[in-house]
Amino acid sequence: IPNLVIRTEEGIFITENKVLINDFNKLPMPNRDLLDISKYMETRTIITSRGCVGTCKFCTTPYYFGKWNGRNVIDVVNEIETLITKYNTKKIIFLDDNATVNKQRMIEICKEIEKRNIKCLFGALCSIKCYDKDLLEYMYKVGFRWVHFGIETGSERLLKLMNKEIDINYIKQVIEDTKKIGYRIRTSFILDYPSSTKEDIIKTKELILSIMPHELRLHYLAYRVGTPIYNENKDILNKTQYIHSNKPNIKNNDLTNEINKLIKELEKENYNMVSNDIDWNIYENADKNTKIAAFTPIKYGMCWYE
């Protein structure tokens, strides 16, 4: 098997290096019969594209996959139909890095879902800078109920340093509009981006409390090889490839105190603070407006309803 890096007792072994297959449509549908998927969460995943048009400095996607590349619409909907008919799937999440980067393609996917009268609940990871109200309204019509926007900070200064290409007023408007459509919304925030100050955390707290997402994923930054932020800091920081680190990279009492204040404020606003994966079981049938915040990966498919 080419393109593998394997750690063995003798050391690190690298198999034949072959060029990445850029034409997504040459790849077969995943064979889910190779493992017992009934042992996993009931929300199934589908990847319909690779890459992203963004250039966020902390993200590997544009540097690993290169330009954005989407699968054929019919192929995508065939896989959706297979998940439903063969595996009795009720919920599917588009696990693309940015499912809505190509508006026309997503419209065509929705049209095909509608044409086949497919009944399923969907979720999608979306870049907030690619937000399109008309598109999300159509997606909602065919069964999409959940979206994830990576916002990362409430500081205009840090947004520019991250190269997010958005501003605070835009963020607030997008979240407000998306809520009105009816979506359950997850947002993510990085709390220890390099040069973060007490004031930056305060601004992040203010933004979170103003937009009140249903799900809040709180991160400490993972420095990933190949990203600009890694290259800028590789000689001075401890690096981790693990995105779910539970320790901040910046040792600063002011930052720590503000993060603790943020947690207390969230609890006052009736956010359920989740500390480990076991806790997800109690939210399986929770109300669709249940608010959750976590430093651990949040389970997909919770609180999705018609």
Residue ranges and their predicted role:
Residues 178, 200-201:
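C-terminal structural cap/anchor segments
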Residues 11, 98-100, 129-130, 282-289:
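Short, internal active-site loops enriched in acidic
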Residues 25, 29-186, 193, 206:
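Radical SAM [4Fe-4S] cluster-binding motif and immediate context
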Residues 1-18, 220, 226:
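Glycine-rich beta-alpha loop elements in corrinoid/cobalamin-binding modules
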